[in-house]
Regions:
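Mid-to-C-terminal secondary-structure elements
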Residues: 3-5, 9-25, 29, 34-136
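Peri-transmembrane interface segments
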Residues: 110, 118-119, 123-126, 137-172
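Short intrinsically disordered, low-complexity coil segments enriched in acidic
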Residues: 1-7, 12, 155, 168-172
Length: 173
């Protein structure tokens, strides 16, 4: 299974990714729903070996897409997940490829903010847009908004529980 990620030009900056070759998805790629893609290093090697993939085509759901870039490797997460095993497409192209051309099927939205105030305003704006787009009222949300801060707190909470559990097990032994 290869992760297809629909995105826009801001994705690279938000995730601190840089191209090792080629370019990244542009606003025009998004606007025109062009059939281009950017590969993680794992998929670049999987499809093309040591060969330069820029300008070559791969088929996604039988439709040819031109490789315009390859991103620098991120390696494995602490949990062992390969962070380079993906294909990035303009989100408009992915929606046309897999779903309807409207944005009702977007699964994940990533963003960054310069301050906590901007982050709160952005979260509020996203919630408002999602409710309007999905025609739902407050309390009927069928989506979730998470921040890295929230995820970090959950991880730290889980780590604390595991530490307590491991301490208890060690005490019993």
């Amino acid at each position: 299974i290869i992760a297809l990620v629909g995105t826009n030009p801001d994705f690279a900056g938000i995730n601190d990714w840089k191209n090792i070759s080629g370019s990244f998805i542009t606003e025009n790629d998004v606007k025109d729903a062009t059939k281009v893609c950017v590969l993680g290093l794992t998929n670049s090697r999987r499809f093309f070996g040591a060969e330069d993939p820029i300008g070559k085509k791969i088929r996604i759901n039988g439709i040819p897409h031109v490789v315009i870039g390859v991103l620098e490797p991120k390696g494995l997460t602490p949990g062992g997940r390969d962070q380079d095993d993906f294909i990035l497409l303009p989100y408009t192209s992915l929606n046309r490829l897999l779903f309807r051309p409207d944005m009702s099927n977007i699964v994940t939205v990533l963003m960054s903010a310069r301050s906590s105030e901007e982050l709160e305003y952005a979260k509020f704006s996203i919630i408002k847009i999602l409710r309007e787009t999905r025609n739902i009222n407050p309390g009927e949300d069928n989506f979730d908004i998470s921040s890295y801060e929230g995820v970090t707190k959950k991880i730290l909470g889980t780590t604390k529980i595991l530490r307590i559990l491991l301490t208890s097990i060690a005490s019993i032994s």
